[in-house]
């Protein structure tokens, strides 16, 4: 078991989101109260660049002696899954996935084009080649017990049943109602933190 002071939590935001999301800010505040290290990078819309950003941060924190804990929201959950299965230090990791995007190469096919970011005036260009990159990032699960999947039945963008089916053997927290952004997130943080901070 790791002491919480030896952990670093990485929050990986979703499509068009940012470190300014309400969940990212709340998690940062809660972890600061516990003295737990926290990273919340502003991920590029390019999947390959986003992976490089995340990998750089994880490797830096590993070199400092931290064990990574991942929280991935929506598309960030897909990225977290890739690291949980592909990173050389995956045996040190655990991940909580919040309404994770299971098959983004399919689900984001209609999003090719330009978009305004959620929390700024930045214009994001999502290219069709990114769908191929996402398809290539699909991985199987080697240790599903290291995942907690939080799936809201009221998710208006993604099907919660896909989330449960994608992660057999994981711990599942299925929430009646709620929504894609988990507007009731504070209610579920105790269970998430109990899973991650050990």
Where is each model-derived feature located?
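Short, flexible hinge/linker loops that cap or flank conserved catalytic cores
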Residues: 1-4, 141
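Active-site catalytic motif of lipid deacylating hydrolases and related acyltransferases
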Residues: 4-65, 180
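Structural motif
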Residues: 8, 67-69, 94
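Active-site catalytic pocket residues across diverse enzymes, especially alpha/beta-hydrolases
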Residues: 31, 87-88
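Gly/Ala-rich beta-loop-alpha elbow adjacent to hydrolase catalytic centers
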Residues: 71-81
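Active-site signature of alpha/beta-hydrolase-fold catalytic machinery across serine-
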Residues: 82-86
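The alpha/beta-hydrolase serine catalytic core
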Residues: 90-198
């Amino acid at each position: 078991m790791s002491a919480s002071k030896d952990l670093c939590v990485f929050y990986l935001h979703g499509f068009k989101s940012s470190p300014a999301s309400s969940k990212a800010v709340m998690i940062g505040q809660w972890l600061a109260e516990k003295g737990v290290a926290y990273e919340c990078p502003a991920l590029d819309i390019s999947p390959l660049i986003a992976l490089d950003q995340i990998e750089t941060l994880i490797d830096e924190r590993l070199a400092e002696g931290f064990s990574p804990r991942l929280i991935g929201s929506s598309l960030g959950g897909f990225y977290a899954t890739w690291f949980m299965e592909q990173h050389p230090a995956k045996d040190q990791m655990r991940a909580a996935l919040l309404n994770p995007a299971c098959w983004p190469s399919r689900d984001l096919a209609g999003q090719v084009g330009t978009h305004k970011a959620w929390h700024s005036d930045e214009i994001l260009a999502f290219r069709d080649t990114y769908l191929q990159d996402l398809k290539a990032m699909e991985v199987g699960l080697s240790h599903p017990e290291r995942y907690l999947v939080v799936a809201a039945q009221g998710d208006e963008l993604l099907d919660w049943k896909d989330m449960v089916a994608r992660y057999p053997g994981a711990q599942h927290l299925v929430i009646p109602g709620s929504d894609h952004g988990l507007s009731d997130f504070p209610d579920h943080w105790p269970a998430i933190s109990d899973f991650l901070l050990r």
